[in-house]
Amino acid sequence: NFAPSSSRWPTFWPYDPNPPAHPLQQPYDPITDPAPLNSTANPGLTHTFVLRSWLDAKIPFVPLLAIPYLSFLALTPIILVLNLWMSSFRRFLTAGLALIVSQLVLDVGYLLFQTEVLRDTAAQEVVAQGGFGGTLVKMVWGNDAPFNGYPSGHVTWTTIGILGLWRLRKVIPKTAWILMAWMALVYPATVMLRQHYLMDVYAGLFVGFSCYWACMFLVERPRLVPKVDPHPWPGT
């Protein structure tokens, strides 16, 4: 992830320059807009949209959720292998193609609509203190800058992974349910680690579901109506 230059977006959104009635200007520019929380970007270097809602301000910071957030990188290819090994090549192809198509959709979104997550002071202080949780969050923050957040790639790929596991729940029930429950922790982790806002999560769910089902109909061609019996019972 990277920040666009300050000239990427024109500052055409109106706002009241007189505090305290000054709402956050969109796109956000650290030079002219005082952030509601401390920004992670250097002043003047970014020019991004901030999708922070009133509900985002009430979400707690939970460093330990970095564990499922980081494990997502290992679980995604495992789910693909399970679909190929325990199910069929078509289901494997559906999941794999959905991941590729969804990433292309995300890339277009990131190109046209650049966002930034403003990490609050309390979260930054926890990370600065170190410890087990702080170290985990440093791993997340150090490898994933708070840009390119709408829609959330983690949420999109997690949704595709859970849909793939859902279709394996009768083949390997214990494994499928355990992995689905664990991967579901990625959803709250994205906002509780200050990586995304809730709008990113909602959009990621939509992209994940849409891409998976579109690829499923393209690859597997499921029947939408029951097959007609060519030799029905007499009198029926």
Task: Please give the residue ranges for each predicted region.
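Interfacial helix-loop-helix junctions of multi-pass membrane proteins
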Residues: 117-124, 145-150, 185-211
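Membrane-interface loops
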Residues: 3, 7-19, 37-46, 85-175, ...
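Alpha-helical transmembrane spans of integral membrane proteins, capturing the lipid-embedded, hydrophobic core
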Residues: 66, 70, 74, 99, ...
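Aromatic-anchored segments of alpha-helical transmembrane domains
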Residues: 1, 103-109, 181-192
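Membrane-interfacial alpha-helical segments at the cytosolic side of multi-pass membrane proteins
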Residues: 74-81, 155-179, 206-217
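C-terminal membrane module of polytopic membrane proteins
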Residues: 183, 193, 203-236
